[in-house]
Amino acid sequence: MDSKVNSYGLIFSVLLIKFKMSKKPLILVTNDDGITAPGIRALISVMNELGDVIVVAPDSPQSAMGHAITINSTLHCDSIKIDEGPQIEYSCSGTPADCIKMGVNEILKRKPDICVSGVNHGSNSSINVIYSGTMSAALEASIEGIPAIGFSLLDYRWNADFDVIKPFIKKITKAAIKEGIPKGNALNVNFPKLKESEIKGIKICRQAKAHWVEKFDKRKSPFV
């Protein structure tokens, strides 16, 4: 796995040293919908309230990539700035699992206190966990010994409303930082698409048993 990390030079070096010396929790943020997706932008805004934030996320959508990693091509990782805020952001040409590997092994100067992935546009319950790039990123962080959480909202729209779930994201992440997550485990948090008044609370449950009904749209190629 070759990698190339392009930075803005001294300013990013200074910021990384600052993070190394900071007493705030160091939070690694990623997703599978791409670094510009509204879900990850909402997640970043919440994480900025809890600690020092480093974002390493795919430069394009990587949904349903599972735990794939890049082997036969070069990974490119570029410093960018999507929104205002104290967070440091990198876009990566690879998969969500690649982003974790790059963040932990190449970009960060110390192991993050927690990794959060999402917020995914759509559910990651049941068998979706196997296909999910969002959860695979969280699991990759867990393999690295980092407490990790994957967040998903049952709303596939690009303009989904994430404001309702922000307080719950903050509460869950804050608790995970304080109390920890058992080693080798990752949390899979799924939010229903509800109004704030309809949300009754947080419930811990087993992974559901379900499967997709496979349907294929068959077409005849005009070039055959």
How should these model regions be labeled?
Residues 10-20:
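Short, Lys/Arg-enriched N-terminal segments with co-localized hydrophobic residues
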Residues 22-23, 27-30, 38-106, 110-111:
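A cross-family phosphate/adenosyl-ligand binding-site feature
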Residues 103-109, 136-147:
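Alpha-helix C-terminal capping segments
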Residues 114:
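Short, Asp-centered acidic motifs that coordinate Mg2+ and/or phosphate
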Residues 123-132:
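Glycine/threonine-rich flexible loop motifs
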Residues 142-164:
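Glycine-rich phosphate/pyrophosphate-binding loops
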Residues 163-224:
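Electrostatically charged, flexible surface regions
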